[in-house]
Structure formats: structure tokens, C-alpha cells
């Protein structure tokens, strides 16, 4: 009789694992952010300015991860920062999106995090948005953004 009980437990565990296994793959894919590099943000510069790459257009609304450096924040309690391709100790952006550099991205944090030094390499991860947008709270104009983002040092 104990053999039957052992068999029933083994069978139950096997059936549970078989039922859960497909969902584990979906969860792993959902949590794996697509990697994006600064060299992949734009495809050309023409009379109308920078043109977003096909990859940026395809990944819009999806979670991406991008490596870079945190520019010095405008204020210590800011809910966002500017991610740059190279370390910058000074403000890397202008007030107009017409002068938007091709190697920065605004990162809007989903939760407060302690900012890091400008020369510490980080990976930011969040939902990609593109197109000119003005932050109603700060007046900050951006062309590329990560929303609901977080970062970690690497």
C-alpha cells in the first residue's frame, strides 16, 4: 500500500510539473528584456533630423535593457535621469528636442533609487517609448524614454 501512495505522490508531482512547465517558459521570456545599444537607436540623420531605427520602432512599448552611464541629475530627488553612452560630468542635453543628442535617453524610474556617480557603468531596464514628449511636471523635452524603469550598476 505504501508503494501505491508513493506512486500517487510521484504521479501528482509529475502532473503538476507538466502543467506548470509551459508557463515557466512564458515567464522567462516575459522577464527577459530585449537588449538595445546606443548605436541601434537611430538609422539616419536627414533634413528633418534624427530618424529612429526600425528596431526602436519595433520595440516601442516593450521592455528593453540598455547599458550606459548616469548623467548628473538635475536635482537629487528627481524621478528620472539621463542615460548617456559615455560618462559625462556636465549636463548632456539642451532645452530643445531639435538639438537632442543621439547618444542619450531619459529614464523614468518606477521607484526611487539612489543615484550613482557619473562614471559608474549601469544597465537601465524599462518600457521603451520614442517621439517628442514634454514632461508636464518638469518641462523636460525628450525623444527617447524608458518608463517604469530601474537600473543597476555593472
Residue ranges of model-derived segments:
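N-terminal export signals
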Residues: 2-9, 13-32
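OB-fold and OB-like single-stranded nucleic-acid-recognition modules
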Residues: 30-154
Amino acid at each position: 500500500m505504501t508503494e501505491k501512495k508513493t506512486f500517487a505522490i510521484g504521479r501528482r508531482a509529475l502532473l503538476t510539473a507538466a502543467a506548470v512547465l509551459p508557463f515557466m517558459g512564458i515567464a522567462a521570456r516575459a522577464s527577459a528584456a530585449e537588449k538595445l545599444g546606443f548605436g541601434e537607436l537611430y538609422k539616419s540623420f536627414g533634413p528633418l533630423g534624427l530618424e529612429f531605427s526600425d528596431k526602436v520602432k519595433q520595440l516601442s512599448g516593450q521592455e528593453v535593457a540598455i547599458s550606459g552611464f548616469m548623467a548628473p541629475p538635475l536635482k537629487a530627488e528627481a524621478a528620472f535621469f539621463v542615460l548617456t553612452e559615455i560618462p559625462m560630468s556636465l549636463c548632456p542635453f539642451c532645452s530643445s528636442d531639435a538639438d537632442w543628442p543621439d547618444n542619450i535617453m531619459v529614464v523614468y524610474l518606477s521607484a526611487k533609487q539612489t543615484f550613482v556617480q557619473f562614471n559608474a557603468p549601469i544597465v537601465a531596464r524599462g518600457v521603451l517609448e520614442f517621439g517628442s514628449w514634454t514632461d508636464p511636471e518638469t518641462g523636460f523635452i525628450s525623444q527617447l524614454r524608458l518608463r517604469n524603469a530601474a537600473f543597476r550598476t555593472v
